[in-house]
Structures are given as C-alpha cells and as structure tokens.
C-alpha cells in the first residue's frame, strides 16, 4: 500500500534539469495516473518543490498547476516538497562532522535556523494559491551534510553524528512544529549510515546517534495539537554574521491532555534559567528528560551510549507554571500533567 507518491524528485537538477513550467506540465500529465484504487485509501500526490530559496520555482510551478483547474483539485497535488541541507562551510568544502570549533558550531546552528525563513517565504507563495492550506509543505530532504568520514567511500556519504547534530535536530523539529499548519511532513533524507542518520551500522553492530535520541524525545509531539508558545531569548555566538538565539522551543498537548515542552539550548557553555508561565492548567505532575553532553560528544561502536536520553529532575512547579535551568548544549523534553 502506497500512501504518498512523489511525482519526480529534484527535477530542477538531477531529476531532469527542467525549468519550472516544463516540470509543472509534466507533473500535471503524470499525476493523472496516480489513482486511488480503493475507497477510503487516498494516495497523496507530492509535487516537486524548490531547492532551498528558489521562490521562483514555487511560484511558477503553482501557477501552472492551478491554471485551468477546479478549486477542489488544489493544483492536482496534496503536497509540495522542499529540500534544504546545512553545509557549515559551503557546498564544496562542507566541513568535518567531528572536528569543528565554536565558530563552526554557531555557524551550523545559524544555518539550521534558516529553515524557518524558507518555510515562511515559500508558505506566503503557497497561501496565494492555497489559502485553506489543503496542500502540505513536504520538507522531504533536510539535515546536516558534512565531508564524509576519512577512509570511507565518498559516494556513500557516511558521516558521524555529534551533539551539534542533536541541536540541529531539536531546532529544526521545533520549527516544523511551529509551522505545522503548513508543514504536513518532514523527512531526514536518509535514516541509516548516510548524512544525518539516526542509526550507524558496521557488520552486526549498530549504534543510535544523538539525532536518534532527539527524535525519540520529540515523538510525543506527533499527532498532538500545537499549543501557542513563545520564549524570551538573547542573541549569542562568536561571529557577528552567525548569531543565534540562545533558546528555541515548541509545545503541544496530546490526546490525553498531557503537555509536552521541547526546548533547545544552543550555547556551548552557558546554562539558562527558564521561568515558564502555563495558562489554564493546574499542574499535578512534571517529568523531564534530556540529551546533553559537550559539543563534540558522539556515539561510537566502542562507546555506544556516550550521548543518550537521561532523566532531568531539576524542574520546580511554581504558582504560575514551571522553573528550571537548562544546561548548555542540550535538548530538553518536559512532560506536564
């Protein structure tokens, strides 16, 4: 059973080097034959969207797909994709997955935060054609992309995974949560052994990466309802060009009424006190779990649990909500009942 069908991939580049109008007409033709063959089991059709900030692609593809179509067809698509990778040092050099300094740490996180601008600006164009948000933005390739590990096949794109990747994951997932009215799906490009993977394998050995543990904490947001939230931040960083906020967050409530707060601390060295006000809720129980280590920490086949989820008990219930201190270089999940 196929739930989602992508009609082409990266057609602006390796998928045909097409211009947007040509691709959109090809999409209209071929999507015709992606049919539902069973009542109640809709195959969602995903149109190839832009690479990074190619807003012209988004505009022209939607214009062509919506031309001479009926409103109920919403451009003959259920989703429009977006691809964005974080290359700390640029496309040609990219940079090491494990050997980096504080400048590169903040540069990487600054580039991860760019995802929000991409979602907003592509979203504005989508709103012109699809104000009811019938079409999901599908961020189906994202994550960090470094120079592959020394001694490995360059074509396999094998890279290690550190606390830096854990922060990129937490930052990005918080952004997706906050824009879940438009972002309906998002996918790390590869799950195992490639780029920002969640698992690394070698023969019969397997290790969970720091990214895996962040995803494991964030799973409680899935199928939950977004809760409006904001946080006071300060700007940090080592270079003027690559400043970042010290904290990011997102909040949801699940079907059982349990509140889930996820917060990232982007600082390499500073912890911060968070005094959270929670409205319309009498707090009875609080639990916390955290992924935190120094910025270069990673899991290896020799030391598989260097970075993992640990209990976080430093959460106080206050009259207005919660108070806690989030350690440097960490991703925190707090459950509130």
Language-model features, listed with the residues they occupy:
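C-terminal beta-sandwich/jelly-roll accessory domains of carbohydrate-active enzymes
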Residues: 230-235, 239-244, 264-337
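Flexible loop/turn segments at secondary-structure boundaries
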Residues: 8-15, 52-57, 86-91, 143-149, ...
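Conserved, mostly hydrophobic/aromatic
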Residues: 5, 30, 80, 122, ...
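Aromatic/acidic polysaccharide-binding cleft in carbohydrate-active enzymes
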Residues: 134-249
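Noncatalytic carbohydrate-binding groove/subsite architecture in carbohydrate-active enzymes
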Residues: 20-170, 232-242
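Aromatic-lined, polymer-binding surfaces characteristic
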Residues: 2-6, 11-23, 27, 45
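Generic recognition of flexible, low-complexity loop/linker segments
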Residues: 18, 34, 68-70, 124-129, ...
């Amino acid at each position: 059973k196929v739930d989602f069908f992508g009609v082409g991939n990266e057609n602006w580049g390796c998928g045909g080097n097409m211009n947007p109008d040509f691709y959109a007409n090809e999409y209209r033709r071929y999507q015709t034959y992606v049919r539902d063959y069973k009542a109640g089991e809709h195959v969602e059709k995903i149109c190839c969207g832009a690479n990074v900030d190619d807003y012209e692609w988004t505009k022209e593809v939607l214009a062509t797909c919506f031309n001479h179509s009926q409103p109920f067809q919403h451009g003959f698509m259920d989703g429009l994709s977006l691809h964005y990778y974080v290359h700390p040092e640029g496309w040609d050099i990219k940079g090491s997955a494990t050997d980096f300094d504080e400048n590169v740490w903040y540069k990487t996180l600054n580039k991860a935060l760019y995802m929000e601008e991409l979602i907003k600006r592509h979203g504005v164009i989508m709103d012109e054609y699809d104000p009811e948000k019938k079409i999901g933005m599908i961020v189906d390739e994202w994550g960090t992309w470094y120079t592959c590990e020394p001694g490995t096949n360059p074509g396999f794109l094998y890279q290690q995974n550190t606390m830096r990747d854990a922060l990129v994951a937490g930052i990005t997932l918080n952004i997706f949560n906050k824009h879940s009215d438009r972002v309906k799906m998002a996918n790390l490009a590869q799950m195992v052994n490639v780029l920002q993977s969640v698992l690394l394998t070698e023969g019969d050995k397997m290790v969970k990466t720091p990214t895996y543990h962040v995803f494991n904490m964030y799973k409680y947001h899935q199928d939950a309802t977004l809760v409006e939230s904001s946080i006071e931040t300060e700007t940090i960083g080592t270079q003027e060009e690559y400043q970042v906020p010290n904290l990011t967050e997102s909040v949801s409530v699940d079907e059982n009424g349990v509140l889930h707060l996820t917060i990232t601390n982007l600082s390499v060295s500073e912890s911060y006190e968070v005094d959270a006000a929670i409205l319309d809720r009498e707090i009875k129980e609080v639990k916390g779990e955290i992924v935190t280590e120094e910025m270069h920490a990673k899991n290896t086949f020799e030391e598989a649990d260097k970075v993992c989820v640990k209990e976080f008990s430093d959460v106080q219930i206050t009259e207005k909500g919660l108070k806690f201190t989030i350690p440097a270089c960490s991703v925190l999940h707090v459950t509130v009942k």
